[in-house]
Amino acid sequence: LLFGLGYRLGGWVSSDKRKSPVYYACSLLAGTLKGYLEQNRFDAVVTPHLYPAETLTAMKKKGWLKIPVVAIGTDYTCIPFWEETDCDCYIVPQKDLLGELIHKGLPKKQLFPLGIPVKQAFSTQKKRSLARKLCRLPSDAHVYLVMSGSMGYGDCAETVQHITNAGVDFQILA
């Protein structure tokens, strides 16, 4: 409920014309991060979250950051405030999201729909029967993957309740 309200308020405040309270809060960390980046002399910064992207944007605006910033989006929607960031490129989870990001004000030439980087082990194909055996799943049961991030998805318990009410034989893994 709280995160949903935050998203709605963020969508109302969010604009590529003005900065949000989120930007100003994140910019308070710019001085500390500046020292760390100068001390370690990185070639680029890669960030998988909006908050450090906001901090890095504040640093760029002050002339404190001269190295490229790469933002990796891990949401399948344009969350509020990405449009007020100034990253050199944005890795987008999927190409279907490009229109939404462009509409919100992110520059098309800086958007790269390359997916969310994951550990190589997740890309390894396994036979379904072997995967079920490794996970101790019955070979004939329906399998539903219900997962959520830290905010925005909604009520996972309600989704599972709908599956339960559908009268389908399934097993819950927790």
Where are the language model's segments positioned?
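Conserved catalytic-core segment of nucleotide-activated headgroup transferases in glycan assembly
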Residues: 134-174
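Structural motif
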Residues: 43-44, 89, 143, 171
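A nucleotide-sugar donor-handling region in carbohydrate enzymes
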Residues: 88-150
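A short helix->loop->beta-strand "cap" motif at the edges of active sites that frequently abuts
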Residues: 65-68, 107-109, 168-170
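Glycine-rich phosphate-binding loop signature in dinucleotide/nucleotide-binding domains
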Residues: 36-43, 137-139
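A conserved, positively charged/aromatic
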Residues: 37, 80-90
